[in-house]
Regions:
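Non-catalytic, mobile gating and regulatory segments of ester bond hydrolases
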Residues: 1-135, 139-268
Length: 268
């Protein structure tokens, strides 16, 4: 297996999307998908507690953490999503003695706490000194962001798909890692909790897929508003549905990343 670095690439993004997609399929299917073949991952660990589920893949050079996203039928997941009230953040692992700065979404913090101790032990035994990559979709994206913040490895990288906002500006400004945030057009989850109650995104490099699946790099409120109108009108007229929920599909994120990777390889 090749080493994954901390620079953004569509090859890395597609692999992270594949991981996040299969995290919904349960432990057995996940292991089957990523351990097969001569280039399969031989060391895959699974952790679960209180509704929070996480896979960790390790090799000599990489340490990859994958959080499962929201299961609509799981009360624990729904409860984590709707607890908007902010609390002070946890201390970062590699910043012992440093005052914690910023406030974090209470539900996401509680969901990560359910599994934090065992994840921290595993990281200390198997992850230090390796390139850390963290990923997830929806609730999983929020947990991936907070996990990377707590580990506090400045070289770590987080790929998030359809991530909600996780905390206030002070929290985000003091996060010491790189986050590549991917958003599919009108994905409604990326707009909650709302900005007007003090939430913001961790996003060092936004990759925004417009209504036609074309990538726009960076944040532009005007451009995205235009795409919101276009996407909403198109789906209401054509499909009689609202695309805000359909655009949150992890399957669509995976397809969009693969399409971009193929396009990039053809151009090269």
């Amino acid at each position: 297996m090749r080493k994954l670095d901390n620079k953004f690439s569509w090859k890395n993004a597609t692999f992270m999307a594949r991981l996040s997609y299969h995290a919904y399929n349960g432990e057995d299917e996940f292991r089957k998908e990523f351990s097969k073949g001569s280039k399969g991952w031989k060391d895959i660990s699974f952790f679960s507690n209180g509704g929070t589920e996480c896979f960790v893949l390790t090799c000599p050079k990489n340490y990859i953490v994958v959080f499962r996203g929201t299961q609509p039928t799981s009360w624990e997941d729904i409860k984590a999503d709707v607890q908007f009230h902010k609390q002070k953040k946890e201390y970062a692992v590699n910043s012992t003695g440093t005052k914690a700065i910023g406030k974090v979404h209470r539900g996401f913090k509680a969901a990560l706490n359910d599994i934090w101790d065992v994840l921290l032990d595993h990281y200390k035994q198997n992850g230090q000194g390796k390139q850390l990559l963290v990923t997830g979709h929806s609730l999983g994206a929020a947990l991936a962001t907070l996990y990377a913040d707590r580990i506090a490895d400045m070289h770590s990288v987080c790929y998030t798909f359809g991530s909600p906002r996780v905390g206030n500006k002070e929290l985000i400004d003091n996060m010491n890692f790189t986050c590549y945030r991917l958003r599919n057009n009108n994905d409604i989850v990326t707009r909650v909790p709302p900005e007007w109650i003090g939430y913001t995104h961790k996003s060092d490099a936004l990759k925004y897929f417009n209504v036609d699946g074309i990538v726009h790099h960076g944040f532009s409120r005007g451009y995205m508003f235009g795409q919101w109108i276009k996407g909403t009108y198109r789906t209401l007229m054509r499909d009689k549905t609202w695309d805000a929920f359909a655009d949150h599909s992890m399957g669509d994120y995976y397809k969009l990343c693969r399409r971009q990777l193929i396009k990039e390889e053809i151009e090269i």
